[in-house]
């Protein structure tokens, strides 16, 4: 079987970009069990409540739901277990220094396969205020309206 090439997105945390200003992004590997990889290859994952924390100078991802593999037996994993993220030591220290500042957090943005290996894109982010969210929605609506007007003008 030939190796996969390219990026196959499994899950995206759309809520993260709505609730946070993402400042920096990093690509990290994930330490997974075999049944988790099989479940991800089927496209099953939810990142809605995901977040990352430091334990013993290691970065862990929590709140990600990867359902049990259908054909798995007693070797199946628990769906919401904590998963270790694999990053270089320099990246870990850089991230830990950033989140020590008040108001910063680490959120998982996207879960994907890159050349056959499971990866997660994490972002160092700061929470948005309610008025920021409303302003973002207003800007998106204005862009949509402008595109609609341009389409109508080009048609006619």
From Swiss-Prot:
Family annotation (InterPro entries): SmpB, SsrA-bd_prot, SsrA-bd_prot_CS
Localization, UniProt: Cytoplasm
Cross-referenced Pfam families: SmpB (PF01668)
Gene3D superfamilies xrefs: 2.40.280.10
GO cellular component terms attached to this protein's record: cytosol
Keyword RNA-binding listed: yes
One GO term of the biological process aspect: trans-translation
Molecular function, one GO term: RNA binding
Alphabetical UniProt keywords: Cytoplasm, RNA-binding
Source domain of life: Bacteria
Ranges for region Disordered: 131-156
Family statement: Belongs to the SmpB family.
Function in brief: Required for rescue of stalled ribosomes mediated by trans-translation. Binds to transfer-messenger RNA (tmRNA), required for stable association of tmRNA with ribosomes. tmRNA and SmpB together mimic tRNA shape, replacing the anticodon stem-loop with SmpB. tmRNA is encoded by the ssrA gene; the 2 termini fold to resemble tRNA(Ala) and it encodes a 'tag peptide', a short internal open reading frame. During trans-translation Ala-aminoacylated tmRNA acts like a tRNA, entering the A-site of stalled ribosomes, displacing the stalled mRNA.
Protein name: SsrA-binding protein
Lineage: Bacteria, Bacillati, Actinomycetota, Actinomycetes, Micrococcales
Annotated gene: smpB
């Amino acid at each position: 079987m030939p190796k996969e090439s390219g990026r196959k997105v499994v899950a995206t945390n759309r809520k993260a970009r709505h609730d946070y200003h993402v400042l920096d992004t990093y690509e990290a590997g994930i330490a997974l069990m075999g049944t988790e990889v099989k479940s991800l290859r089927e496209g099953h994952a939810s990142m809605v409540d995901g977040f990352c924390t430091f334990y013993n100078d290691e970065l862990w991802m929590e709140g990600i739901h990867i359902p049990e593999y259908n054909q798995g037996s007693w070797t199946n994993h628990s769906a919401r277990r904590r998963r270790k993220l694999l990053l270089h030591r320099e990246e870990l220290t850089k991230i830990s220094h950033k989140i020590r500042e008040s108001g910063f957090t680490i959120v998982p943005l996207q879960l994907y396969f890159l050349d056959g290996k499971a990866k997660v894109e994490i972002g160092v982010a700061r929470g948005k205020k309610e008025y920021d969210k409303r302003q973002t929605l207003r800007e998106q609506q204005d862009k949509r309206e402008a595109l609609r007007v341009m389409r109508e003008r080009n048609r006619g």
